[in-house]
Amino acid sequence: MRQILLIVAAMLLTCCSSESDMNAQTNTNMGKTLIVYYSYTGNCREIVNSLAAQVTADQLEIQPAEKGLKYEANGYALGTQLLNAIKANPDDAASYPAIDPVSVSLADYQNIIIVTPLWWSQMAAIMQTYLFQSRDQMAGKTVALIVSSHSSGISGVVADAQRLLPSVTWAGDALWVNASNHSNRASLISTWLPTLNFQTTATAISHVNADRQQHRAYTLSGTLAQAGRKGIVIVDGKKYVR
């Protein structure tokens, strides 16, 4: 992954007394990454295992509320029924199949990697449910997509992801893992990861408690800036370049 270097030196504030009592509270996600996946046949779980060996990330598995369903039975009748219901009313929560409750807070993460199977040229309905329910929490996140299919192209899944997550920043092109290259997935992932434009540090100081008088400078990650460091400094709402 590309390292995003913060060259902005950040805030100067006026503080009181010789020993200023300043407490910079920074964003806590600090570029943390979450892998969100749904796996019906087990292929996506294998992809996640290979991915987890190469990137530091937490994992969240999405599960359907109703267990044991055979989505592929009778010519994929049930899977097609679920997808058609979503296509008919994509903005209606009732159109999406129920999933198990999720306790993970997306506020703890800046980067999200979605790993999903393809169902008849579309994103699996179970993953669509999670993204529909989480679209507001994902706003402003940096997101990457891995799609597993047998042989079908993934443009329909990419379109579903873009529809469901209109307010995210896409880190790069989606990775397609199919039946012919699944055994080579680790190599595919290692080639793909460096192409992603993921955020790896915090981007802001969320809150500063300060008394007035003495000046101190803090970086955007919340650490005390070194004396003489070049960058953009804000003093009493005015921007200075030093």
Label each PLM-derived region with a short phrase.
Residues 18, 199-223:
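Residue-level detector of functionally pivotal "anchor" positions at catalytic/ligand-binding pockets or at interdomain
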Residues 40-43, 64-68, 118-122, 149-153, ...:
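Solvent-exposed loop/turn segments at secondary-structure junctions
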Residues 23-114, 123, 190, 194:
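N-terminal beta1-alpha1-beta2 submodule of the flavodoxin-like/Rossmannoid cofactor-binding fold
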Residues 1-26:
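Bacterial Sec-dependent N-terminal signal peptides
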Residues 77-167:
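Helix-loop-strand module that forms the ligand-binding subsite of alpha/beta enzymes
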Residues 169-201:
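Glycine-rich phosphate/pyrophosphate-binding loop and the adjoining helix
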Residues 232-242:
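C-terminal tail/sorting-segment detector
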